[in-house]
């Protein structure tokens, strides 16, 4: 019983929280082909990939104040919708787009974590990305197609063990 239970701990497959600022991976990593590790740079060097600092967003969005890409009118993803989300980013970081300065008046964003592994699980992003060369999509799914990010895989112990078996990971050394 206990083994079966442990194999299913933390199943949140399909979990798709609404974030305080809408962020479309479909636009950023899909249409614009921004590499995952540009924003999630800590995945290369750390146990955790983490949520990027808004400063990373501002690397581009200091100069991109309006959305000028494809729309999905059926779902309400219009140019105005996306532009308003950029304005939320500006408000959060205290960016005055007219004066093009940071005001110091910031409002921290309370992002909702999507992938929550139990405390007893040891997972190291850097080990998987650098040593094994695992593509982000292996665990995170087709992120470049996700308008709203969600937990693609179950990330259970059984799911991980199955991947290790299929890829012949040497767990003895």
Predicted features and spans:
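Sequence context surrounding c-type heme c attachment/ligation sites in exported
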Residues: 17-69, 118-173
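Hydrophobic membrane-insertion alpha-helices, especially the h-region
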Residues: 1-4
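Primarily the internal scaffold of c-type cytochrome electron-transfer domains
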Residues: 55, 64-121, 169-173
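Early transmembrane hairpin module of multi-pass membrane proteins
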Residues: 8-13
């Amino acid at each position: 019983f206990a083994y079966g239970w442990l194999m299913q701990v933390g199943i949140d497959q399909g979990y798709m929280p609404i974030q305080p600022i809408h962020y479309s991976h479909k636009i950023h990593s899909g249409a614009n082909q921004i590499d995952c590790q540009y924003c999630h740079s800590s995945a290369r060097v750390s146990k955790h990939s983490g949520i990027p600092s808004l400063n990373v967003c501002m690397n581009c969005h200091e100069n991109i104040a309006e959305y000028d890409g494809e729309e999905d009118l059926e779902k309400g993803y219009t140019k105005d919708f996306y532009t308003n989300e950029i304005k939320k980013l500006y408000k959060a970081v205290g960016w005055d787009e007219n004066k093009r300065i940071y005001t110091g008046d910031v409002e921290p964003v309370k992002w909702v974590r999507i992938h929550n592994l139990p405390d007893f699980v040891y997972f190291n992003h850097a080990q998987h990305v650098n040593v094994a060369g695992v593509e982000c999509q292996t665990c995170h799914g087709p992120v470049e197609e996700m308008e709203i990010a969600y937990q693609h895989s179950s990330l259970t112990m059984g799911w991980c063990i199955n991947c290790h078996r299929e890829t012949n990971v040497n767990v003895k050394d």
